[in-house]
Regions:
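Metal- and O2-centered redox machinery and metal/ROS homeostasis
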Residues: 1-170
Length: 170
């Protein structure tokens, strides 16, 4: 994981966030027609990534032209949207650890490029539990359950391929 690499500096962090934005922004657009009851706008990560990139020195013109991932997982129904969201929502838990690492190593906080790492702030736990509760109550057929699982697997794989292609994994 880049965050723990000895060569990981502020420039590498900025490049990593650029790649994260290139994955999250188009994927969030793809998710937007599904699962309105989960308050997709509240759960969006791309706005926090933009704030971080601007805090780290990128201009709006530069962030408007960032490359976006074209190898996204398919989101064709609520079941696949849930699989994608499982990965994206779960990452907020890891962000809680990474925000402390970035604060200690580079002095990054909410205002200076760390908003994405703490995107839900004190609501991280409750939003994660709310998502799990929704997932638990979702009545899915065996085929839909398989789509949810496959979408989660595809999201992990797509994200890793994207980060490798952007050459941000140290």
């Amino acid at each position: 994981m880049p965050f723990f690499s000895a060569g990981f500096d502020l420039a590498a962090y900025r490049n990593l966030l650029m790649a994260y934005h290139g994955f999250h922004a188009p994927l969030e657009r793809r998710l937007s027609p599904f699962l309105a009851e989960l308050d997709q706008p509240r759960r969006a990560k791309a706005p926090a990534l933009l704030r971080d990139l601007h805090a780290l020195g990128l201009t709006p013109a530069e962030t408007d032209t960032l490359p976006e991932c074209q190898m996204l997982p398919a989101v064709t129904c609520e079941a696949s949207a849930l699989g994608v969201m499982y990965v994206m929502e779960g990452s907020t838990l890891g962000g809680q650890v990474l925000k402390r690492v970035m604060a200690e190593r580079m002095g990054v906080d909410q205002a200076s490029g760390g908003a994405f790492l703490d995107v839900y702030g004190t609501e991280t736990g409750s939003l994660w539990r709310g998502f799990l509760l929704f997932l638990d109550r979702y009545r899915a057929s065996p085929e839909e359950q398989a789509r949810t699982v496959q979408a989660a697997i595809d999201t992990f794989a797509s994200f890793e391929r994207w980060l490798e292609a952007r050459e941000v994994l140290l």
